[in-house]
Amino acid sequence: MANIGKWNAPSATVTVLSTGLNSLANATMSAASSNIANQTNLDIYVDVEVVLASLSPTTGAFVALYILESIDGTNFPAQSDADLRLTTTQLLVAIPVGTTATTAQRVAARNIVIPPGLFQIKLDNQTGVALAASGNTVKFNAYDVNLNG
């Protein structure tokens, strides 16, 4: 049957943040990721996986991912972290960390819309504790929809 939308196979899983998360203090943002280029693939969606090495998050803990888009293909917004937190239009996703157990945490969010251009990501640690000295990652799996079935 023609004209049925189906998922396309996702792109390769890409680690967008890793060592920049090491020992990241609570209520602190990471440095921006390397540039993530979506000008060619023009993927629409991304699934995000955040792995936090062993920690004891507090009740209500979460991590937030902010997106910095380069509208002109060269320059990125230069907001302070405090201002970025007030700019909800640049909040990509907030992901709850649903346990306070002392263990590694693996949390994910699905079907997040991404821009058709160059962008970077920052992680805001709101877990109530500093992240571990190693083993923390943010990974993306980008994909789109085939509308020709």
Predicted features along the sequence, with ranges:
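Internal, hydrophobic beta-strand segments that form the core of beta-sheet-rich folds
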Residues: 42-52, 62-69, 114-138
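Short consensus segments that form the blades of beta-propeller domains
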Residues: 55-59
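Signal that preferentially marks extracellular ectodomain short beta-strand elements
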Residues: 31-36, 53, 106-111
